[in-house]
């Protein structure tokens, strides 16, 4: 397995400079989703003082022709700050700033700025207090694309001992996981936990519960932090939903969803109603649940390795081979939440959460989202 050249630089030398005082100035790292709908870009600017809220942050611009978001002849694009976090790499008072991207200033979002519409949809149902929790699976790779810790000319032992495993022969890359976890806590990201997954070198972290639009904000920033931590260690975190073909588990982003009514007494009734609506709109959700409209998920949702079949909708209590799982405790208590197991690891959480709201709460039907008037 190959690690990056940058990871071999002397980090102690860097720390000499990072410990220098920065006066009253603040470094703000602006983050946005590029034209792939999966990749993240970032750049930093200096502020004269520490911003207390996202509204105090200035808008900025970038070259969209270099991020697959515009043509070179008209490449200026705009960044509008949307959410602000503490910077775990430069530390206080510096900030991470998740931004929405726009083609022309104030004239419509970029194609991969799915947050813009998601925010409108979330605002329409804010009185129902939708909560989400997303389980982000990922796989650690060397820069040569070989899974971290796997034999160079073969495969590790079969799946079985790796899920929540302990020991050098079972847990591959825990240092990265622990560093990411602590960095998220420092940043203020709502990370709920982490665990080793079924395939060796595959891990999961959970974000939530988050209400409304904050689900996407927190997951995207958690992904950014993971990429930056991996950069320091010289490895890659991939969200490919099936990074290794064959008899190995894929990677998903199981999404847990509830409303205030579902969480209250006899909320199971509303959970079952939502599942019935989802059953009639399966293909719409499949298209919304990965950035390639279902093509990525087709490699993962095979009906094997704890997945449902991409062509069929199913639901059940404690059933990890179903499209929708109702946790056993929810079935017993008759209130709580349900888990949509279809989203791929590389999904856009804004797309996933918006689709759930449209179908379950706005009662949309059909294969296309409804266009609401402003």
From Swiss-Prot:
What reaction is this protein's catalytic activity? L-glutamate + NH4(+) + ATP = L-glutamine + ADP + phosphate + H(+); L-cysteinyl-[protein] + hexadecanoyl-CoA = S-hexadecanoyl-L-cysteinyl-[protein] + CoA
Cellular component annotations (GO), alphabetically ordered: cytosol; endoplasmic reticulum; mitochondrion; plasma membrane
Question: Which residues belong to the signal peptide in this entry?
Answer: none
Chief localisation class: cytoplasm
N6-acetyllysine: modified positions: 11, 14
Give compartment(s). Answer: Cytoplasm, Cytosol; Microsome; Mitochondrion; Cell membrane
Sites where the protein binds L-glutamate: 247-248, 320, 341
Q: Which residues carry this modification: Phosphoserine?
A: 344
InterPro entries for the chain: Gln_synt_N (IPR008147), Gln_synt_N_sf (IPR036651), Gln_synth/guanido_kin_cat_dom (IPR014746), Gln_synth_cat_dom (IPR008146), Gln_synth_gly_rich_site (IPR027303), Gln_synth_N_conserv_site (IPR027302), Glutamine_Synthetase (IPR050292)
Q: This chain belongs to which protein, by name?
A: Glutamine synthetase
Task: Give the source species.
Answer: Macaca fascicularis (Crab-eating macaque)
